Amino acid sequence: MTTDVRRGIIAVVTVLVLVALGAGIGVAAGDALGIRVEESDRMHPAEPAIARVEASVPTPSFTDIDAPDGPRFEAAIDELTDATADAASDAEQVALTVTAGAEEDEHDDAYNLAVDGVRIRIDAPTEAGAVRGVYDLAAQIRAGRAPEDLAGAHGAARLPFRMVDIGAVGVTPDPEEWRPGTNYSHISEAFRDVYLDEEPYIDDTALDDAFEDWEEFLRTSVAQGYNAVAWPGFIEYVDFARAPGGPVYPDGDPHIARAAALREAFAPFWDRASELGVDVFLRTDMLALTPALDDYFTKRFGGADTENPELWQVYADALDELYADQPALDGVVIRIGEAGDIYDTPGWDYYSALAVRSVDAVRTMLDVLTAGAEASDTEVVFRTWSVGIGDVGDMHIDPESYEAVLGDIDSDALIVSTKYTAGDFYSWLPLNETLAMGEHRRIVEFQSRREFEAFGSFPNDLGPELQWALGELLAQNSNIEGIWTWTQDGGPWRAGPMSLYLKSGFWQLYEHNTRQAAALARDPDADLAQVTADWAREWFSDDPATVAAIAQAMARSRSAIENGLYLAPFAESRVSALGLEPPPQMWLFEWDILTGDSATLDVLYAIIGPHRVQEAIQGGRVALAAAERMRADIEETDAATWRDPQLRDAFLETLDYEIDTLGMLGAYREMFLALGEWHDTGSPEAYERWQHARDDYLARAAAHVDAYAGDVDHPAWNLTAAQLGIDRADRDLVVAWAARILLVLALAWLVIGMLSARTRLVRRPGAAAARAAWIASTRPWRARESTLGMLALDRWLLVVIPGGLLVATRALQTSLLSWTHLAIVFGAWLLFLLVVRVCVGIRSPYPVIAAVGGVVVLRCIVTLFALAFTGPGGYWFAFWTEPFARVVYIAIAFALFVWAFVAAGWAMSMQVGGRRATGFVLAGVGAALAITAFAVAVVGLERALTVWNDEMGLLPWGMARILGITTFLEIPASTPWWAAGAGLVVLAVGALLALPWRRRTDSASR
C-alpha cells in the first residue's frame, strides 16, 4: 500500500468520523430543542347566559338600624348606607335588626334574613354570618332587587378561604411612567412615596394617603366576600436578631432601624384588616436575601445551601419574631419559581434568588417553616408555581412531580396554592390536574386582570370558565378550601394600560371577574348571568335594556379573546420545547410584544400545518366580527340611560381599541403563515399572499401606532420585533437569488479546480489557484506541492476567493443585517490565520492557505445551497421544523468545519512535522477562542446575545427584555470567561507543541 493510498484511507475515515460526530450533534440539537406536540384537552365551560333584566325596585331608606357594635358591623352598615344613598325623599322607610351569636367560627358565615313588612331582620350564629347578611342586603339593593327576594336561610360559603392581592394600594398613577410602555418590571412600586432612603425611613403624609387606599380596598374586598389578603414583603420587616452565629446586621446597620420603622408604619394597616375580619399573609419569593444575609449564609453554610434545615431555621426564627411583634399577621405566602432583576425593588438591596431548585430543598423548606407555623398558630401558603426551575420545574402541572415534592408532607399549617390552568393564565389550556390530588389543604388561583390577554383592557368575561373549573375540581378534591383572586397583580405593571384597581383607567372591566370569583367561592352554582347583570347595573346603568346590552357584549367577549389573541389550531395542542411547555399564545411574546423571531413563527406554522392555515386565519376574522358586534351592542344603548357618560365613552373607546388591535393581529397572522407556507412549499402564490398580507399589516400597524402611541389607557402594542422580522423577510427572495448566483460561481471554482488537476485548464489564469485549493482541501498532504510555482495572481486568488466567498456567504446568511455575527465569525477566522501565519514564519504560508481556503469554499457551498431555496428565512425554517434536514446539514457543516483545521495541520505537517503542525493549529484555535470569548465577556454575555439575537431574529426579541436570554436558557453569565480560559489553555498547549524540541546529546567522551 502506497503512502498516498494510506493517507487517503485515513482522510476518508476521518471525514466519516467527523460526519458521524456531526450527525450526533444534530440529533442532540433536536433533543435539546425537544419540540413535541400532543393533543390537549381544553376546558369546556358553558356558553354565557344573559339574565332577564327587570326594572329596578325603588331604593328603600333605612331609618332605624340596630346592629352589634364593632368595626366589622360599622363597615357593613356604611356599605348599606351607601347603597341606599340615592333613595328618594319619599322612599319606603325600613328598619333593620341584626343579631349575631357568640360562636367564633369564622368559616361559618351562614345567616337568615326575614322580611316583615317594613322590618328586616338578620340572624346569624356568628359575627361573620351577620356581617355577610348586611353586605348581601346592600348588594341586593344596589342590584335594584327587592329585599324580600333575599329572604330565607343562606348557608355558609362553600369555600371559607377567599384571598386577594392588595390591588393597586400605594401605587401612584403617574402617566409619564406608563407612557413609554417599555418597563417590564414586575415590581408594583407600591408605597414608593412612603419610603425614605434615610431615617425616619417613612414619609408620614404619604403613609396617610396609602392608608386611605388601603381602607377603600379592604372595604371593597370585604363587601365582595373576601376575607384574606396577600401583602407583598417579608425580608424588609425582619432583622434576623435570633440568627445563630449572628448578627446578620451589625449594630447600627440601617437594615435594623428600617425594619423597625416599616413594622411600625404598616402595623395599623394589618391591624385594620384584622378588625374587618381579613387575614393578612406576607407574600415573598424564596430565597429572599440582602447582601448581608447572603454573606451570613456563605460564612455559616458555605453559601445558600437550601437543603440545609439550619438555613431555613434562620427564616423560621425571623418569622416567629415578626408574628410575635405583629399579631395581626396570619402567615406567609411563598413562591420559589420566579426571581431576578425584574422582581427587585429599585433603590433597595432586598432581592430574591432562584435557589430552591431541588426536591430536597423544597421539602426541607416546608418541613422547617410549617413546624414554626404550627408552633405560632400561623399558616404557610406554598405556591407550586415552579416554571421549569431545577428538578422541581414542572411541579406546578405534573402530578408525578407534585407527588415527589409534596406527597408525604403532612402539616395542618400548610396550604398549597396552584393556578387553575395547566400553566399560566392563558386560555385554551387544560385544567390543572395537580389540583385534583394530594391530601393537603388547597386553594385555587385566579387572575382577574388577565396579563396575557391585553391586561384587562379588553372585555373578558371569565365567569363561565372559572365556574366550570371550580366545579370540576371540587368534584375531584374535597381538600380544596379556598381561592386566591389576583385583582390587579401579575406581569409588568408599567408595560400595559394604566388601569389600576379602584384608581385609574377602565378597571371596572376586570373587577367583574373579581366579583364572579367571590360569588363562585361562596356558591359554585352561582347564577353568573345575574352577577353580570348586577355588576352592569351598579357601575353603568339602571336601565334594563342597557344592562341587557352590556351583558350581551360581555357574553361575546370570550370569542374575541380566544380567537383574536390565539391561533386555535396551535392553541389546542400541548407543545414542549427546550424542556418547557411554551404557552398557547406563542406569537404574542409576553403581554404586548408581537414576536417576529423565526423559532416561534416557523414552529407555529409547522404545528398548524398547511391544511389548517386558512382555519387559523379565519379565527382572526371571527374575533374581529365578535368585537364589532360588541361595539354595536354598546353603541345602540341610549346614552341618557348611563350613570356616567364617561363610562359609556370608556366602553366604546376600549372596544374601538380592541377592534383596531384585532384587525392588526389578523393581518399579521395571515402574513407570517403565508411566509411559512412559502418557505415550506416554495409556492409563488404563497409568496404573493405574503406580500399582500404584509402590506395590509404594515398599514394597520402604522395606523395603530398613530392612534395609540402615548395613550396610557389604550397603549400601542410593541411592534418592534414584528418589524425586525419583516425587515428580514423582505430580503429573503433577493438573498435567495444572490445565494444561487454565488452557489453557481462557487461550484464553477470547484469544478475548475477538479478539472485543472487532470487537464490543460491549469494553464488558464486562476486555474492553478482553484486546482491548489481543491487538492489541498481534499488531500492536504499534497498542499505544498500543489502550490509550488504559482503566479502572483493565483496566490492572491487563493486568499481572495475563499475569503470573499466566506464574507458574502455569511453576510447573506444574516440578510446583511447582523454585523455582530460577521464581526465574531471573521474576527475568529482572522485571529486563527494570523497566529498560524506567525507560526509558519519564513516558510511558505500558501499550503495552509490553500487547505483552509479550499475547505472554506466547500463549507460555503453547503450554506449557499441551503440559502438558495427561499433565503435565510427558509434556511432557519428548515432548521427549526425539519429534523432530518437539520441533522444532515449539521453533520456536513460540522465535518467540514473541523476538517478545515485537520487539513490545515496536515498541510503544515509536510513542512514542520506533525507535532509542530498540530501546535500551530491549536495555538490559532486557542487564540481565536480566547480573544473572541474575552471580547464577549467584556461586553457582557447577556448584552452580546441580545444584540446578536436582535440582528438575527432567531429567538423571541422580548426574551432579552423581560427575563434575559441567559436566564431563560440557563446559561451561566461566566460562560465567556470560562471559554476564554479554555482558549488560553489550548493556546498554551499549542505553543508548547509548536516549539522546536531538541534532544539532549551527551557530549562526554567515554
Model-derived features: positions:
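Acidic, contiguous N-terminal accessory segments
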Residues: 18-119, 125, 146-152
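Selective detector of the "anchor" transmembrane alpha-helix that sits immediately C-terminal
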Residues: 734-757, 981-989
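Selected alpha-helical membrane-embedding segments in polytopic membrane proteins
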Residues: 772-859
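Feature activates predominantly on carbohydrate-active enzymes
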Residues: 63, 76-79, 107-110, 116-316, ...
